[in-house]
Structure formats: structure tokens, C-alpha cells
């Protein structure tokens, strides 16, 4: 147990596993720099995110972390200070997010809407026009090709609309659900090992 309550998103610094941030419901965050012996709160001012609020670090600079409400926040010092980035113009809080490995692209979603930023979160463009009107459960960039994005859906129906692939950062989408069953898809990772 890191802090108690409902455990949500967490990150461990990839170069120093004594540095961690754990989060609670609605995005409350606690940080430790000594493996959990001491903790401090590290939220942006007046912060209230979604029930499970996205929290992630930049794969190009692990001291840079992101969290979000309907606005994206970035910390360049592992949570000590926060900068407000662009407004997503989504109705409600951002529920899912992914950061590209090799560029400044960030994808975000709320319910059935998916947007992408090409400038590190300052502005966003809608890319969900040709996708199903269903609840998006996860987003992933291909770690070897930032143009490739996969989006998953959490529907129970036998609608064959669970997993979609774009190879051009969301300009066009291909349904790659194939023969998956009637269960919702909750998470996706692209693995090239």
C-alpha cells in the first residue's frame, strides 16, 4: 500500500525506482523520492480529474510528467511545479491518453471522442470522425512508429468494433477486431519483441 484509498494510476521513474507517484480517485497524487518512506502531494492547483485520471511520463524525458482534467498539465520536475498546456475542448475530463515515443504527439480521449496534439499538448485536432460512437478504453502509439495508433473500445455487444488501427496518426482507421469475442477490450500495448 502506497497511500490508501482506491489506487489508480502510478508511475515509477525508470532511472530511479525510489522516485514514484501514486494517484487516488479523481487524480489526487502523492510523490515519494525515497521508495515510499516520505510522501508529498503533487497536484496542480484546483485539480479534479476523472475517476481514473491519466498520469504518465514523457518517454523522451522521464522527469517530464503529464496529468489532465479537460486541460493538459505538464511538470518538467517530476511533479514539483506544473504548467497548464492547451484545452482539449472535450466535454468532461480526459479519460485516456498516450504519448508518442519519438515526437511531440499526444492522443487523448473522452467517451467516444479522440483528439491528437502534434505540438506537445498546446492544440488538439479531432481524429474520431470515422470511428465508432462507443466508449474508448485505451490508446497506444507504436513505439517504433509514431504514425501508428491503436484505439480500443469497451463494448459488450457482438458488433465487431473493438480495436482500430491508424497508420497515419488518425487520418484513416482500419478495424482490426477480427474474431475477438463479445467482451470489452480494456487495454492495448504494441510489443515488437
Feature roles, as predicted:
Residues 1-193:
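Beta-propeller blade termini and top-face loops
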Amino acid at each position: 500500500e502506497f497511500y490508501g484509498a482506491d489506487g489508480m494510476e502510478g508511475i515509477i521513474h525508470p532511472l530511479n525506482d525510489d522516485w514514484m507517484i501514486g494517484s487516488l480517485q479523481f487524480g489526487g497524487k502523492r510523490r515519494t523520492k525515497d521508495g515510499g518512506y516520505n510522501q508529498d502531494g503533487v497536484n496542480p492547483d484546483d485539480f479534479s480529474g476523472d475517476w481514473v485520471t491519466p498520469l504518465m511520463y514523457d518517454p523522451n524525458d522521464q522527469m517530464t510528467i503529464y496529468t489532465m482534467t479537460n486541460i493538459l498539465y505538464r511538470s518538467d520536475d517530476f511533479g514539483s511545479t506544473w504548467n497548464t498546456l492547451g484545452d482539449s475542448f472535450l466535454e468532461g475530463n480526459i479519460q485516456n491518453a498516450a504519448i508518442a515515443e519519438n515526437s511531440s504527439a499526444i492522443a487523448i480521449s473522452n467517451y467516444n471522442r479522440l483528439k491528437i496534439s502534434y505540438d506537445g499538448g498546446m492544440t488538439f485536432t479531432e481524429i474520431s470522425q470515422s470511428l465508432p460512437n462507443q466508449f474508448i478504453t485505451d490508446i497506444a502509439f507504436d513505439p517504433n512508429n509514431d504514425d501508428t495508433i491503436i484505439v480500443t473500445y469497451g463494448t459488450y455487444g457482438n458488433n465487431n468494433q473493438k480495436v482500430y488501427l491508424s497508420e497515419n496518426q488518425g487520418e484513416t482507421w482500419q478495424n482490426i477486431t477480427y474474431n475477438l469475442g463479445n467482451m470489452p477490450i480494456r487495454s492495448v500495448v504494441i510489443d515488437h519483441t
